[in-house]
Every structure is written in structure tokens, then in C-alpha cells.
Amino acid sequence: MADEAKAKGNAAFSSGDFNSAVNHFTDAINLTPTNHVLFSNRSAAHASLNHYDEALSDAKKTVELKPDWGKGYSRLGAAHLGLNQFDEAVEAYSKGLEIDPSNEGLKSGLADAKASASRSRASAPNPFGDAFQGPEMWSKLTADPSTRGLLKQPDFVNMMKEIQRNPSNLNLYLQDQRVMQALGVLLNIQIRTQQAGDDMEIGEEEMAVPSRKEPEVEKKRKPEPEPEPEPEFGEEKQKKLKAQKEKELGNAAYKKKDFETAIQHYSTAMEIDDEDISYITNRAAVHLEMGKYDECIKDCDKAVERGRELRSDYKMVAKALTRKGTALGKMAKVSKDYEPVIQTYQKALTEHRNPETLKRLNEAERAKKELEQQEYYDPNIGDEEREKGNDFFKEQKYPDAVRHYTEAIKRNPKDPRAYSNRAACYTKLGAMPEGLKDAEKCIELDPTFLKGYSRKGAVQFFMKEYDNAMETYQKGLEHDPNNQELLDGVKRCVQQINKANRGDLTPEELKERQAKGMQDPEIQNILTDPVMRQVLSDLQENPAAAQKHMQNPMIMNKIQKLISSGIVQMK
């Protein structure tokens, strides 16, 4: 049940449904409250929802349960970063690296935490920070007619939440007139916002907080002519508009597959305005589409470097890293080539947890694993390892035999013989679930490989699942009706089933069989079926009705199942 909930949580997380992921991981935690991986996963889901307090709580629990696990400290550091607790984040990442010095995620996280801590110490406190604190902010914005309607706009609400979480983020949104309007309401002052057709942006002098008497003076003054835009502001805006125009022309050319023209426009935009890294990432996308992967990687590195200098949006930096990872993946030919791909995607995810990037990371890890298997594939060495395993098996050195059979499987994962032999070893060692899994793999690889049925039936017999073992042996006999090993297996199962039917089991055997039977979902369904409950009641109280029931083949099969499991005894 816990594994199922965990799997659902992972699937929801990969698809970007973080709320569902939290719910599924919570269900799994309720079933296995000491599983550190579940707390780690839920911490990541909370962080993706910007619920950093909850993410921190789960990360602390992860470290408490598994203090020697590097990923726990990665979660802890990420949560502290989200809460702008930069020194604590540095400490968490550093502790993680003491445990796992080669972990790229921890290295990248530590670098980001140190950079954030440095920026935090270097930047002056925001003078407007108090205006955005507490629930009073939302009350003021709701009460004022000029901002009430803005609260219906999701992007505006998200910006205000970001500013409330970290008042320093106000600098990122000062060009948004809605934010300026909200700032005026919160500070109880009148701030002139840019109207359509204005050529200048708000200067610093316009943001100075006036005295409380100034609004009254403004009303008494005669209207004055609009001041001429200061040249530096007008030129700056014109420059940005010109760069944006070049970007739009580049986008249009890109859509038409006119890549050379697109590159020219993006390059021109970069020359005009070097403070917007989207021009660089767009040019990188063109290089990627053209198959010029080295050029794409150079542009992505340039975008990341420039983005950090400008303190650009983390999402833009993450996009550049993701694009670089894609280019590296296109160039990968052997499994080792995927290592920088995976590292780059991991760095992108530390910047911004994006479902698409996570999907690409999973694909890269899967491709690396598949290539490793292909590169390791060698049937001749596989046969040698299997023979070594056989020698150890004969000497009853089963752990050594398992090791060689495992190596044989790695060298040739399509050979059912290695799985069959390892299943026999697991059976000898009492590791029945592992033995059953290997036996089923034998049958999956080659349905005509009779040893697979023999191994699976033997494991089920030792697990006292006699009905299941009987069914397995009979499936094998469909391929070879005269196979003596399978016939002997059927005979042993019949003896045990008849022993139960006659009531010859000892009290201990009966109790054990009943307990095992109650774990069988089929038995549970039979016992909860209203029709079968009536049948069982008639068997005890109404022999005539019971006789009619026995004429129904389906009911008879279910009764036989209950008898075999020891739940029902016929006397």
C-alpha cells in the first residue's frame, strides 16, 4: 500500500501536480512513518508549491531519520533557501557534502546559497518592506477601489506574494504599473503611474514619499504642463523597445524556419540591450534547432553567467541550463557522455523546479542506464560467470553463486538460464520473494523454458501456496506434458491439498494456512461476497440449499479455494 501511494506521488510530481503529490506522499507516510525517502519526496513537493515552512519540517524529519543521507541535506538547504535563511542553507549543504562530497546537487546548492547570502548582506534593506508584511496588506488592497480589481489577476497576486515573502523582490516589479498602484495604496500616498502614450518610466524622485500635507497642496495648485522626459530615461526606453522589436522579428523568422535571419535579429537585440538574457537563450534555441550544439552551449553558458550578474529571474537561468542539457544530450554517444547532461539538468532544477526539466532528467538517466547495459553486454563473459555460479552452487556456497549469476545477468540480461539458477539460489537461502521474481522473469523471457515453471512452482510450494504452485506446474505441462519434474510438482501439491481437505493438518499447520489464506486478495473477496456468505451459512444450517449451491461450478471453485486455504473444513 505504501509503495503504491509513493508511486502515485512520484507520478503526480513528474506531471507537475504537486498538490496531489503531497497527498499521496502523506498517505504513504501514514502507512510507513519511518521511511525517510517519503519525507524527502514530500519536502520536494512542498518546495515546488512554495510551501517552504512545510518543506523545511519534512526536510528536518528526513535528516533525523537518515542523518547519513546526502539528499536529506539537499532538501534542508533548498527549504532554507526558499525561506531566505541563507546562512542556514549554507550550513545544510556543507553538512551534506561532508557525507557525500561528490554530490553535484549539493555543490550547486551550496554555491547558490553562498551567492544569495552574499547578495543579501550586500543589499540595503528595502525601505518599503513593512508595507507588505502581514494580512493587513491584502485587507488594504481589497478595500481600495483602485486595487480591488487587481486581486482577480493571478499574475498580480503572485507578484505581491513574492514581494511579501521577500520585500527585496519589489525592485524586480517596479516597472509594473499595478505594483506601483498597490504601493501607493499601502503607503497611503498618491503615486503617479505611467499612462498609455508616456515615453518615460517612473524616476526615483517620483517615488519619494511626500508629506501628508502635500496631496492637499496638489489639489490647490493650477495644472502645470507635463514635464519633458529626461533624455536618459527616454533613450533607455527607446533602446529596450528597439531590442524587443528585433526579438519579435527573430521570433517570426524562427517560426518560418529562417534560422540565419533569426540569429541576426537576436544578435542585434543583444547588442542593443545586454540586460535581457532572453535574447541569448533565444539564439541558443536557434543553434539547437540547426544542430550547432557547441554554439548553443556557448550561448547558454553566456546566458547563465550574465543572468547571475544581473540577478535575473531564476526561471530564465534554469531555462538556459535546461537548453544546455538538451544540447549536451544531442551530442551524447556513450553512457559517460550523459554525466554532464544529468549534472546540467540537476543544476537547472536547483534554480527552478520545472516538470519538463525533471522529465528530461529522468530520460537522460534512463538513456545512460540503457547505454551502460549495452556497453556491458557480452554473452561470452555471461556464460563464464554463469558456469562459475554453477560451481559455487554445487559447493553449496549460495551467496557466492548469487554474485556470479548476477554478473551473468548484467552481461546478458536476455538469458533465462541465469535467472533460473539465481532463483534456485534464492530458494536455498530462503529469499522466496526474490526467487519468485527471478522465476517469473525466466518465463517472461522464454515462455517455453520449463525450468522457469519448475522454479516458480517450487518457490510457491515452499511458501505453502499450493493452489498457485499447482497452477504454475500445469502451465508448464502445457508446453511438455511428459516433463517429470513438473509432474512430480503437481503430485506434491495434490498431496498437500488433499491433506487439508481431509482435515489431517495439525493445529499449527491449520493456523498457519488460515493466516496465509486471509492475506490472499481472492480469499478476501470471497469472504466479503454477500452471495458466498449466504452459501457458507447454508452449508452449516441448510444442507438442502447447500446441495443446490454445489451444483454451480463457480461457487464450487470458490468453496474449494476456501477449503485449500484452511478457512473452511469439510467433515
UniProtKB/Swiss-Prot annotation:
GO molecular function, one term: Hsp90 protein binding
Residues found modified as Phosphoserine: S168
GO terms for biological process, alphabetical: chaperone-mediated protein complex assembly; response to cadmium ion
Highest taxon of the lineage: Eukaryota
Renumbered ranges of TPR repeats: 2-35, 37-69, 70-103, 243-276, 278-310, 322-355, 382-415, 417-449, 450-483
Ranges spanned by the short sequence motif Bipartite nuclear localization signal, renumbered to the chain: 240-257
GO annotations of cellular component type: cytosol; nucleus
Modification comment: Phosphorylated. Acetylated.
Keywords attached to this entry: Acetylation, Chaperone, Cytoplasm, Nucleus, Phosphoprotein, Repeat, Stress response, TPR repeat
PROSITE patterns (UniProt xref): TPR, TPR_REGION
Start-end of Basic and acidic residues biased regions: 211-225, 234-245
Amino acid composition bias (Acidic residues), ranges on this chain: 198-207
Locations listed in the record: Cytoplasm; Nucleus
SUPFAM superfamilies assigned to the protein according to its UniProt record, in alphabetical order: TPR-like
Region (Disordered): 117-137, 198-245
Plastid among keywords: no
Quaternary structure note: Co-chaperone that forms a complex with HSP70 and HSP90 and preproteins (e.g. chloroplast preproteins).
Record's comment describing the protein's domains: The tetratricopeptide repeat (TPR) domain, forming a carboxylate clamp (CC), mediates interaction with the highly conserved 'EEVD' motif at the C-terminal ends of HSP90 and HSP70.
Free-text function comment from the UniProt entry: Mediates the association of the molecular chaperones HSP70 and HSP90. Mediates nuclear encoded chloroplast preproteins binding to HSP90 prior to chloroplastic sorting.
Listed name of the protein: Hsp70-Hsp90 organizing protein 2
Organism: Arabidopsis thaliana
Source species taxonomy: Eukaryota, Viridiplantae, Streptophyta, Embryophyta, Tracheophyta
